[in-house]
Amino acid sequence: MSAADLSLETIELHQTGRVLTARVVAPPWNFVTTAVVRDLDILTAAADTDDTVGAVVLTGGLPGRFLTHADPAALGGMIDKPRPFVPARAAAPFLRAAAAVLHVPGATGLVERHGGGLGAGLVWGYRWKRTTLRMNRSGVAYLAAINGPALGGGHEIALACDLRYAADADHVRLGQIETLANLIPGGGATQRLTRLLGAAKAIEITLEGAPFTVRQALRLGLLHRVVPAPDLLAETQATAARLAARNPLVVAELKRAVYFGADKSLSRGLDAEQAAFVSVGTTAAAARTTKAFFEDLERLDDTPFLADPQPWLDGTRVDQVSR
C-alpha cells in the first residue's frame, strides 16, 4: 500500500507527483491528540518506505487551524490529579524502561488499550519522539504549511519539519505556551529551539510563553517564509516539489548531518525533556491548572491561549506557584 492510500482517523492525504499533502482534521480545535500522533507515526513510517513520496506537506484541514497545541486530555493519565511529586531524575529511568517495553512489536497497542490513562500517555510520548526523530532522519523532506495557531505541541511538530512556511494572517500565532499551563515543553522544544536559535533565545521563549505573530517568528528565525494566506499551500507545495526531486539518500544524509552531526545527544536530550515534563506534571499546581484550562475551554468554546490569553500570560488565571 502506498502512503497516499492510508486510511487515517485524523489526517486526509492527497498526492500530486512526489508531494504528499497531509491535512490534519481533528475537530473541534485541531489539538494534537493521541489519534493525531498515532496517525503521524503511521504516516511517517509509510512515507519512508514509499519510493513515490519525496516530500510531505503538513497543514491544518480545519478552517484557520494548523495544530493548535497538545491535547490536555491526552495527558490526563499523567497530570490530571495530584500525586506524589516525582523528580525528573526518577522519571528518566522509568521512561527509558517504558520505551524499551514499547519498542517490542505490538506493545504500543496493548499498553494503549489496557494501560489506562498513564499507559496511553506513555505511548503518546513514545510515538511523539519516534515520529519526530524519524522525520529528522528521513530521506523525505517535511514542510509545514502553517495556516493557523501553532502553539505548544503544535509548534513542536512544526519545529520537527525541515521547512516552515506560514500564512500572513493575524490569527496565526506560534510559540511555546507550556509555562502558562504550569508545565515545560515535552515534545522537543527545549532541544530544537536551543539548536535552532541558541540557548539565550530558547530560554526566553520558553520562560515567557507568549505567542509570536508570524512577522515576529520570521525575524526570530522560527519561520523560513511568510506567504499571503491564499497562496500558502500552493507555494509550500511548489517548494516541496523541488525538494522531492532530490536524491532521497542525499536528503537523508544531509538531514542527519545537520540535525545529529554536531551533537550526538539529541535523543538523550529528548529523554531528559520528557522526564522533566512528567515530573512537573505531578504537582498539585499542574492539576489546578489543568482544571482551569478545561473550565475556560468550556466557557470560551476554544483554547484560552487564543480566546482569552492575557490572564494566563499574566499568571493570574490560576495559582501556579503553591505546592
Give the ranges of each region predicted by the language model:
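Catalytic-core regions built around general acid/base machinery
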Residues: 39, 43-46, 127-139
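Glycine-rich phosphate-binding loop at the start of an alpha helix
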Residues: 125, 129, 152, 211
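CoA-thioester-processing core
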Residues: 131, 135-139, 145, 151-205, ...
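C-terminal alpha-helix plus adjacent terminal tail
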Residues: 1-17, 63-65, 209-214, 234, ...
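Conserved CoA-thioester-binding segment of acyl-CoA-metabolizing enzymes
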Residues: 1-66, 76-77
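Short acidic-hydrophobic, aromatic-tinged amphipathic segments that line or gate anion-handling sites
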Residues: 165-167, 223-233
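Glycine- (often His-adjacent) and acidic-residue-rich active-site loop
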Residues: 60-130
